């Protein structure tokens, strides 16, 4: 009897792993991404990526496939030293004037000054939902994990496994939510000296070029976008591989909420929901809702 139970358990585990395998990929960059610009300013080799920026050009890639719900993650090491004027970006996006987008952007700074972790979300073409943080670690002396988790209930931004931001789904109350467009994954390194560092006051020092940002071990556990049919398929809880539809992912745990609040209390430097001057007192409607 014990032998039969063991065999049954092994079968169940094997089936679960097979199901997970259809949605989980540690990507070979050269096979799973294409260069969108700066082909001679980048290097892809297996699970390693190098993006290069000099005065002539930057570089960017995008995934060959799009996803609707799940999680994507990448280990990233940012430009060291004086990175003023540079922006490294890692984000999900669809296309068109009513596109959806979920952003991580890393705004460089002068030597000795901290980076800015810039997050934003667009739904049906509408953005202006920025939240910014100072890193509580050195993002240039090693690789750190940046994860975007996206399900029918909420979008969560994670840094090294700790949530830093949540955007919840209030579509039933007329607030747009990114749930009807497949999004591809993008990574880029580019010059944004007109605004990126201290409002554009500090420019890029091109004598320090080339600037290099690195990525490693990109992984996607996400629903493959197959067109409009995916809008229903990717939220179907009866499909075993749709793990993100589990009620356990509809809201952060108490422990996660505690960790996130510590980061937000200690390291958040901008929240659009508190910028009454910018919106002239007419705040975005989601700002009055439960945030987490």
From Swiss-Prot:
Sorted alphabetically, which Pfam families does this protein's record hold?
Answer: Glyco_hydro_16 (PF00722), XET_C (PF06955)
UniProt-annotated catalytic positions? 101, 105
The source's domain of life comes to Eukaryota
Q: Sorted alphabetically, which keywords does the UniProt record give?
A: Apoplast, Cell wall, Cell wall biogenesis/degradation, Disulfide bond, Glycoprotein, Glycosidase, Hydrolase, Secreted, Signal, Transferase
Q: What PROSITE patterns does the record tag this protein with?
A: GH16_1, GH16_2
- Role: Catalyzes xyloglucan endohydrolysis (XEH) and/or endotransglycosylation (XET). Cleaves and religates xyloglucan polymers, an essential constituent of the primary cell wall, and thereby participates in cell wall construction of growing tissues.
Write down what this protein is called: Probable xyloglucan endotransglucosylase/hydrolase protein 26
